A protein has these predicted regions:
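Helix-loop-helix "hairpin" substructures at the membrane interface of multi-pass membrane proteins
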Residues: 198-278, 303-304
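Short loop segments and helix-boundary regions at transmembrane helix junctions
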Residues: 7-18, 87-94, 113-117, 123-184, ...
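Transmembrane helix-bundle core of multi-pass membrane transporters
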Residues: 155-224, 332
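Single transmembrane alpha-helix segments in multi-pass membrane proteins
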Residues: 35-39, 53, 58-113, 126, ...
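Membrane-interfacial amphipathic/re-entrant helices at transmembrane-helix boundaries
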Residues: 2-78
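Cytosolic-side transmembrane-helix boundaries in multi-pass membrane proteins
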Residues: 1-26, 236, 243-250, 320-379
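Loop-to-transmembrane alpha-helix initiation sites
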Residues: 147-149, 203-210, 252, 284-288, ...
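Transmembrane alpha-helical segments in multi-pass inner-membrane proteins
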Residues: 263, 271-338
Length: 379
C-alpha cells in the first residue's frame, strides 16, 4: 500500500512551532500597545530596541553582550527542563523557583564558606534542589498535597532561608555575597578558552555547552528509556499506570527529585560563573524559576525545543533593558519583557485551537463526502 503522508500543518512539531510564533507575535503586539498607552511618541523606538536586543551594539560589544545572554540562557534552560520533566508525570513544578534558590544557597555557601571546587559546589547545589523536590513529591504521594500549593509555600520558605544562610558570607559593605573572583576563584566554572569567542567576556564558561548537553540527555531519558516511558504513562493516566504494575508513587517522587536537581543545577551554572552575586536582602523569589515555565511551554514541552525558546526569552529580556528610560520609567523594561514572556506560555492553547480547526475541517469534509455518496446511490 502507498504510504499516506501528512500535510505539514498536521504534523505535531509544525503545530508547536506555529503556535509558538503566534505567541511571540502576540506578546510583541501587546507590549507595543502598552507602550502606546503610556507614551505614544517613543513606543515604536522602544519595541524596536527590545527586538534588536544586543544586536544594536557595534561588533566588539555585540559579542560581549551575546556572551552574557548565553550565560544567563544556561540556568533558564535548566529551569525549563525542571518544569517539563515534572510535567511529563503530571506534576506542575511551580516550586522550581524555590529549588533554584536552594541550589544557589548550597553552591555559593560551599564556595565562599568551605572553599570547595566548582564541581563540588554544583553537586551540592543539585543535591539541595533535589531534596526540596523530594519534599514536594513526598507531600504529594503521602498526604495528597497538591504540588502547586506545596511548591509556592516552599518557594518563600527557601528564599528566606537562603537569605539567612548566605548572609553569613556576604560582603560587609553591601547586601551582596562576596565575589568569587576575589575570594575563591577555584569555585568559578572554567571557560576552557570559550571567553575568547566573545570578546574576552570572563563570565562565558563551559556552563553553556553543559546546559545544552543536559537538555539532550533529558530528551534521551524521556524518549529512549523505560523510565521515561513509565513517567509519561503515569502522567497520562495515573490509575492505568498503577494497574499495569508501575510504581506510580515512586515515579512521582523520583521525578520531583530529578526536577529539583535540574533547577539547583541551573542556579550553580549561573552564580559559579561570577556574572552576578546573590542579594541577601531580596524579598521576592527570583524570576528565573517562573520564566522557566514560559520557556518550557514555548518550547512545546520538548527539551530540544527549550534550548531555542530559552535563548529567545533571554534575548527579549536583555532587549527590555534597552528601552529609553528618559521616555519611560525604569520598570517598563521589566513590564514589557514579562508581557512577552508570559504570553509565550499560551502555546498549548493555540496548538489546541489549530487542532480543533483541523478536526472541524475534517468533519465537514467527511460530511460533504457522505452527502455526495448518498446522492449517487439515490440515482
Amino acid at each position: 500500500m502507498k504510504k499516506e503522508h501528512k500535510s505539514l500543518i498536521r504534523k505535531d512539531g509544525f503545530q508547536t512551532l506555529l503556535a509558538s510564533l503566534v505567541c511571540v507575535l502576540g506578546g510583541l503586539i501587546v507590549g507595543y500597545l502598552v507602550l502606546l498607552i503610556i507614551e505614544p511618541s517613543g513606543a515604536f523606538e522602544a519595541i524596536v530596541a527590545v527586538m534588536k536586543s544586543f544586536l544594536r551594539f557595534p561588533g566588539a560589544l555585540k559579542l560581549k553582550y551575546f556572551g552574557q545572554a548565553l550565560v544567563r540562557t544556561a540556568p533558564l534552560l535548566l529551569c525549563a527542563l525542571s518544569v517539563l520533566f515534572a510535567y511529563k508525570v503530571g506534576m506542575f513544578n511551580i516550586g522550581a523557583a524555590g529549588q533554584y534558590c536552594a541550589g544557589a544557597c548550597a553552591a555559593l555557601y560551599a564556595a565562599l564558606a568551605w572553599n570547595m571546587p566548582w564541581y563540588v559546589c554544583i553537586l551540592l547545589g543539585m543535591l539541595a534542589g533535589a531534596l526540596l523536590g523530594m519534599l514536594a513529591g513526598a507531600l504529594r504521594t503521602l498526604f495528597n498535597v497538591n504540588v502547586v500549593i506545596s511548591g509556592i509555600m516552599l518557594n518563600w520558605i527557601t528564599l528566606y532561608l537562603t537569605n539567612l544562610v548566605l548572609g553569613t558570607v556576604k560582603n560587609p559593605t553591601s547586601p551582596y555575597t562576596k565575589t568569587l573572583q576575589s575570594t575563591t576563584p577555584g569555585a568559578l566554572i572554567p571557560s576552557l578558552g570559550l571567553e575568547k569567542l566573545f570578546n574576552n567576556e570572563k563570565s562565558v564558561t563551559i556552563a553553556i555547552p553543559i546546559a545544552v548537553l543536559t537538555a539532550v540527555l533529558v530528551w534521551v531519558v524521556l524518549n529512549k528509556t523505560k523510565f521515561g516511558y513509565e513517567l509519561k504513562a503515569t502522567g497520562s493516566n495515573y490509575n492505568a499506570a498503577k494497574y499495569c504494575g508501575m510504581k506510580e508513587n515512586q515515579n512521582i517522587i523520583l521525578t520531583m527529585v530529578i526536577a529539583g536537581a535540574l533547577a539547583g543545577f541551573g542556579a550553580g551554572l549561573l552564580y559559579l560563573t561570577g556574572i552576578e552575586d546573590w542579594e541577601t536582602t531580596i524579598s521576592s523569589v527570583p524570576a528565573m524559576g517562573f520564566n522557566g515555565i514560559a520557556v518550557a511551554f514555548l518550547g512545546g514541552l520538548s527539551p530540544i525545543g527549550s534550548i531555542l525558546s530559552a535563548f529567545f526569552i533571554q534575548y527579549i529580556t536583555t532587549g527590555g533593558g534597552n528601552v529609553d528610560l528618559q521616555v519611560y520609567c525604569s520598570q517598563i523594561s521589566s513590564l514589557i519583557s514579562a508581557l512577552i514572556i508570559y504570553l509565550c506560555a499560551f502555546v498549548g492553547f493555540f496548538k489546541y485551537f489549530i487542532q480543533t480547526r483541523l478536526r472541524k475541517a475534517d468533519e465537514r469534509k467527511a460530511a460533504k463526502a457522505a452527502q455526495i455518496q448518498e446522492g449517487g446511490e439515490d440515482k
